[in-house]
């Protein structure tokens, strides 16, 4: 069952439990899953919430020794350090050299429940200019599913919508496909209009679109007169890859200066 949107993910243990299993799955994929584990954890928060929630989010994962079972295997996990970074910024870290050539860039992260925006000044995030909209792919899909049901009496799911938008083969009637395209175009325009109301004018500043919504909305964004120049990072792992790069760099600096501190590291 999909977890509903939560601004503060520390309110209960659901995200902590999901993180435990994500760690176990990643280590298994790397061939490093063992009964006793000690890890450094790199996580992220939406830019708008980073300043107020980062310490609380870091402490959320600092619980000493945690025992759980993964695929019938007992595991004892110790999270040694927690690194917290702004989402969106992390996703473009691999492009730092290219970004040095541009004085201002908006990073637009279209996720499941929200669209988050961060302003970069060359390669540095301007944490005073963060915007967030409660508009995302899940919200759009729910609206499309309801409209298709009402207009055409056909029950569709998220995968049907993605197939149509991405141009993959589908047996859906043409009128249903037309409805999906029309609603997606309308929703992408709504996102761009709302961003402009928040002084995110993509006619004056280039943008990098990331997140699952970047690939879905790409054709609509590229053809919009509201966007002068857009690059896309469709890899849904982009933020996670950036967290890893930032954390490795920070660990290296800590080792150089013999740092350690309280085990909570802020980006």
Write out the residue ranges for each language-model feature.
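Short acidic-glycine loop/turn motifs at beta-strand connectors
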Residues: 121-123
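Short beta-strand scaffold segments in enzyme catalytic cores
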Residues: 115-119
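Nucleotide/phosphate-binding catalytic cleft detector across ATP-hydrolyzing
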Residues: 1-105, 125-138, 159-267
